[in-house]
Amino acid sequence: MTDYKNTLNLPDTGFPMRGDLAKREPGMLERWYEQDLYGIICQARKGKKTFILHDGPPYANGSIHIGHSVNKILKDIIIKSKGLMGYDSPYVPGWDCHGLPIELKVEQLIGKPGEKVSAAEFRTACRRYAAEQVEGQKKDFIRLGVLGDWEHPYLTMNFATEANIIRALGKIIANGHLHKGAKPVHWCIDCRSALAEAEVEYYDRTSPSIDVAFAADDVRAVAAKFGAADFAGQISLIIWTTTPWTLPANRAIAVHPDFDYQLVEVEGQGYILAADLVDSVMARAGITCWTVLGSAKGSALELLRFRHPFMGFDVPAILGQHVTLDAGTGAVHTAPGHGPDDYVIGQQYGLEVANPVGPDGCYLPGTLPALDGLQVFKANDVVINLLCDSGALLHVEKLQHSYPHCWRHKTSIIFRATPQWFVSMDQRGLRKQSLAEIKDVQWIPGWGQARIETMVANRPDWCISRQRTWGVPMALFVHNETEALHPRTIELMESVAQRVEQDGIQAWWDLDPAEILGDDAAHYHKVPDTLDVWFDSGSTHSSIVAVRPEFEGHAPDMYLEGSDQHRGWFMSSLMISTAMHGKAPYRQVLTHGFTVDGQGRKMSKSVGNVVSPQQVMDKLGADILRLWVASTDYTGEMAVSDEILKRSADAYRRIRNTARFLLANLNGFDPARHSVSPEQMVVLDRWAVGRAQAAQAEIVAAYDSYDFHNVVQRMMQFCSVEMGSFYLDIIKDRQYTTKADSIARRSCQTALYHIIEALVRWMAPIMSFTADEIWGFMPGERAQYVFTEEWYDGLFGLDAAQPLNDAYWQILLQVRSETNKVIEQARADKRIGGSLEARVTLYAEPDLAASLRELGDELYFTLLTSNAVVADYADAGDDAVQCEGLKGLKIALAKAEGEKCPRCWHYETDIGQHADHPEICGRCVTNVAGPGEERKFV
């Protein structure tokens, strides 16, 4: 028997079937960095319109986790897709390098500054530790396939950046937004430092809930307000609190001016309570019998005085709109040193901002003998005993409630008034301007706008000073007596910045004030505080983007971080940019959700559900991780597990197999010599290129709107359905059996070439390693890397005006689908083996029949049968199957006549009719020894 294998155009490519990504990707990375791929991209994009995605700096501490991977991959997808859109989109990764977590790590290694090591030695150790952490994280980020200027990242501890952070503060001071005050701020006892809003987390805590009686200083005056001048007993205003330890700092009691208050008598004692809360207070105090003596508005109680239960002084009743009837008594214990609302109202009444608590959370000496030196949370019971002894405790119980905790230590924090520096939200209109700027930013998803608007509207002044060692100094000089800033503050800060630019932040602590103050050094001293680390990262639009040459002075277009950054980096950046320049630092803000396991649970080592990006890359490869990120809707929680990653790996294989089929069938094709013009191409091939054109339009639009999961879905639909289930199946016969250099085959290869040119670009932002691998196997002259290209512009489609247009092929897809159902049933019934053993008759209504006859004797190629006949619908016999999915069509199937051709596998009746080739069919004889068959449609 003659072997006709050498007469077939069998697929052949060096592109492997298996990705082996975990093994192959590291070698590709090595090549990328040896050849300076990022530099090549920058050179290719030079002079194009810019798109700047500014990297929010991760903290330089610890290994990267799956959330870091999501963040960096999303950024990389955007950067690469913007490049394909024709943008110059430089990416400069950064790290946040100052702050408490690094201090704590270094303390564990070498001890606290001022003990075993000097502050200068401690800072040097912090800098060294942060640099080590950056290098470790950098390797993992690079392994993800993220392209950027990894050789020159920005670090907030770079000398020039530290100097620019000081300059940013100088600009804010020049614009009048800084002030100093002894305001209550979030204070962590363990950190011994103020905390930013973004460093506070809320957890449930059980606290003592107490009702306390403040006895009236002038009973007659108070009783008269309620029309009960004859009442002779003691009268007390009852407050409610869950922080008994703050009572030593009480300086007033706030009531609402518009609420009704009642004076009620209980066993000869008079209690003042909000009328709406009398029943609930009496119920929890176990009091069943009382008499209402009179009522008065809260406004009538203003400035009446009441005795502190154990501190030996009296305090006024004051009016406050913040008082509510949600819980308590309607009278609010007011300690201006321990609460923001208390502080604000205290300023209105000129109250003392008392702060009897030290930085360690213990009462200062001289507070009260029973409390001096006691830690505040341990003092609650002592305070309650003091209240019992004075007869002022009406009721006590345990209450579980949400309470602020330190994000680092997970321990309860306190409000504590200390002299701090603040960026004011209102003294120069920063809040109002920020709210206006928010409206000009595109927030993705849209709910982000309302979220940050609420935060800005309600946030207090920003405490930017910290009492830490490892941080950027505030670089301020204040008067020894008045604490006023030096009149040449801006000039002096620039002088300090220049020194820091040369020698780093240590230059500030080494600075002798006389060097720049001259004679004024006798009257001014250096402020020892450092800046909140959120000021470091929040000023990078100025300290980094505005000065890096690759950004060419352009402002950032996009910030992209996790949804927790509305109150973190997005907020601090907005505050600083608006305070400096009167405008937001970004045009778009995109947020992604947190990663959870397959059951929607937060990842936890104790639960054992943590997915390590390093392990995923070592097992499956970075492209699988990248494909998972892209295919997940990032606007909500992002679920990841072994099973979910397995599904991503399956999707990857389908896309890879499509690419491999295209490459294998482009064997021997040179686009410069073999391309067929659209007018000469087989109609089905033009249709396939048109489907790629339609897919590309949707994919590019999805990339542009950052809908990456829709990119993946459309790519999968194109590869699996439009190509894999239809076109690629149909063309195998023509591709393999026609003459190698025939129009029929070259038309098909031309289509495959256009499709792979488009597909590799669609893949590049997401499956970057695989796209680069494909690029290396594609025919024709091309640039070194796909990453320097733009979207493929060589696609074209069918003319909608011609009969065999897209709509026509959609009908044919339906006919093929219905035919496949009949064939599958026949195979199940053992009537045939494969579809080429079948001969089908399509009984169709007149319009459909006319459409099917357009393909002439090429119709059967679309159905993958050996023969297909179109007949009138009315002539269908009982053996014809009515199609459910396509009305007006019945299909009858019979076994194909003739013998199986060993070359094309079709069943034909003309085998043996050619003396030189007696074993093959007439069509194959034409392709082997004759002029070759012609194809017009299929």
Swiss-Prot record:
GO terms for cellular component: cytosol. Binds 1 zinc ion per subunit. Its main location: cytoplasm. It is found in: Cytoplasm. It holds the Pfam family zf-FPG_IleRS. A motif ('KMSKS' region) lies at residues 602-606. Gene3D superfamilies: 1.10.730.20, HUPs, Valyl/Leucyl/Isoleucyl-tRNA synthetase, editing domain. A motif ('HIGH' region) lies at residues 58-68. SUPFAM superfamilies: Anticodon-binding domain of a subclass of class I aminoacyl-tRNA synthetases, Nucleotidylyl transferase, ValRS/IleRS/LeuRS editing domain. L-isoleucyl-5'-AMP binds at residue 561. ATP binds at residue 605. GO terms for biological process: isoleucyl-tRNA aminoacylation. Its cofactor is Zn(2+). IleRS has two distinct active sites: one for aminoacylation and one for editing. The misactivated valine is translocated from the active site to the editing site, which sterically excludes the correctly activated isoleucine. The single editing site contains two valyl binding pockets, one specific for each substrate (Val-AMP or Val-tRNA(Ile)). Monomer. This is Isoleucine--tRNA ligase. It comes from Sodalis glossinidius (strain morsitans).
